[in-house]
Amino acid sequence: VTDLSAEYKALAEYRPTNKVRFVTAASLFDGHDAAINIMRRILQGMGAEVIHLGHNRSVDEVVTAALQEDAQGIAISSYQGGHVEYFKYMVDLLKARGGEHIQVFGGGGGVIVPAEIAELQGYGVARIYSPEDGQRMGLAGMIGEMVMRCDADLSVYAPKALEAIRGQTEAHWRALAQLMTALENGKAPDALKSALHAAAKDTDIPVVGITGTGGAGKSSLTDELIRRLRLDQGDALRVAVISIDPSRRKSGGALLGDRIRMNAIGPWNAGPRVFMRSLATRDFGSEISQALPDVLAACKVAGFDLIVVETSGIGQGDAAIVPLVDVPMYVMTPEYGAASQLEKIDMLDFAEFVAINKFDRKGAADALRDVAKQVQRNRSAFQTSPDAMPVFGTMASRFNDDGVTALYQALLPRLASLGLKVAEGSLPQVDTRHSTHQVAIVPGARVRYLADIADTVRGYKRQAIAQARLAREIQQLREAARMLTEGKPDKARASEAAIDLAVKREAKLDADAKQLLTMWPQMQAAYAGDEYVVKIRDKEIRTALTHTTLSGSKIRKVALPQYEDHGEILKWLMLDNVPGSFPYTAGTFAFKREGEDPTRMFAGEGDAFRTNKRFKLLSEGMPAKRLSTAFDSVTLYGNDPDLRPDIYGKVGNSGVSIATLEDMKVLYSGFDLTNPATSVSMTINGPAPTILAMFMNTAIDQNLDKFRADNGREPTADEAQKIRAWVKENVRGTVQADILKEDQGQNTCIFSTEFSLKVMGDIAEY
């Protein structure tokens, strides 16, 4: 147990006097987010407002967030290497973009060694915490020190005149963020606020207010609407997003977690177009921030084309956003209870648009009908069909969802009527008001398929026991009839009765069970010899059935049970059986591969040339080549290597860098990938389908090159096709792609879990 000094105990109990804001994240190509999640929870508990970005975040993303959120500190966990380049690049970028006062903190367990800690702190990083610091200070002490060092009022940096925020350059956005801090803290001069509201009155910038229950998917829907606006309008419009989350009443801290859901706010080809600021409700006791009217005025003066406000989760009677926005939107899910509950929801009176998100959930179609009917009642629009009400079924979590597109295409004309300058859209029109084309990974009729599997297995076992009982009784009855006939000829009628009973039972015995019993003597003979012959992929493989120990004893590789009772024999054959035979309890192959030691030639560092050299060193003189490949984190996340420092530091670090088919060919050059003694294991997750395709093409091209070398000509189309088919049948290896583990643990998933599982199924089917 750590014995903390009085100094560290005081740090652990530190509470800030100012509103301290932190941006937290795990570094680029790093999915180890357990540590940073613990740190940000302690930060929240100490009263800090935390803008959490999650894992796999580039320096540019973190710095942009810190500047727009006007945070005092950045906290980064880095467990995947490349930390020296990452942190130095962050310090450089902060200085270059007007955030030199923002303090950077980091940690990475034992990955960041003392010499590197000294180097980074000397470069300008506020503090890198080591495991020894954790032991000495305790987690709360470490976080307390971070909060104490960042406990400053940033309102002093706010601009004194409105000209500083009029414009859409990075400098204007930085000044806008600093002004918002002063407005939030109540430190902006009254004269400046009066001028701000006076200037805002002269603008015609539409404001959309998105509100709804907690967990309804407001942030994801906001992100998808912004994505469609940017795609549809050629990324010509500039958007401000104001996102509000609740403060914790006990500690004063807050998790400002909406930014983690935003995937469409980064710079595209035309550069930055979306400014985002997260606000905490603080002590206002509402779903909005007390500073929201001032913040909206600042955004209008800054000259954005559109402002989107997303509130924190609300209850049935809340509608505080309505007077502050031009277009209120209510987001809900199909789970609201009885239809009468809809009569209690205040926002259904005020919302111009209603989105029933998570439309894939049970009862969604009924919810769409009921909500549309309630909106019709609220508006007394009985001359209009409920289907024409502005109620939409959406699935914001689904790529290119037509329900979200329908909502966007209904919203855009309303925004245009309020002054938004829209061009002719490029998105095709959709003719629906809710999500369609819902293809479930597991069809509705098979959602119980795991239970079906369990039922099938239990049923099979019951059948095996019943069949074994029949086999035993048949053997017993026939043996009794034989003994009666031999011992007492006058008992012929009893003997016939026994045979009749046996025949009746034989009729109930399955054909498969009869065949197993018929083949039992042949199986005994086959395993009693010195060799066993089995066919695998049209190849006849002979295997010695005995193994001689060091003491000269002969031991059989497969020993059959010495049963004579037909019931026991059949039960064993149906429930256990020999290796390579159903139900495969002892494996799918009859015997283990011989002539190949179970070694693992593990390599992966630097580029393909270096790792190939390492493979050759490891496998030198070995008859079997069992190559096990580790890929660097850049490859694991499906990205290309780059000279940008936060990427460059991770290229070839703790794994080989593979970005192209040519890299893959170099990696395995000199190894015959279709040789039966060659096996390749690849530890890859997110981009597993792509890497597997590269490997297959490497093996195919290797054999096409071999054909050219052997025959002095190009293969014909038919010959090439036969070579491809032969390679796919004969190549050996393993793709270690456990996407469910990644979803829960290391986070190297670049597609959704559902999509990844579907692709894995498609590959298996192919």
Regions found by a protein language model. Name each.
Residues 183-205, 216, 221, 225-317, ...:
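Nucleotide-state-sensitive switch-loop elements of NTP-binding domains
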Residues 78-83, 284, 302-305, 311-315, ...:
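Conserved Switch II/interswitch segment of TRAFAC-class P-loop GTPases
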Residues 119-147, 345-425:
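Canonical P-loop GTPase G-domain recognition
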Residues 156-160, 378-496:
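C-terminal end of P-loop GTPase domains and the immediately downstream helical coupling element
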Residues 208-210:
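Hydrophobic anchor at the beta1->P-loop junction of P-loop NTPases
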Residues 59, 80-84, 110, 123, ...:
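Catalytic alpha/beta active-site cores
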Residues 29, 36-141:
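Cofactor-cradling patches in redox/metallo enzymes
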Residues 2-9, 139-206:
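Extreme N-terminal, non-catalytic leader segments
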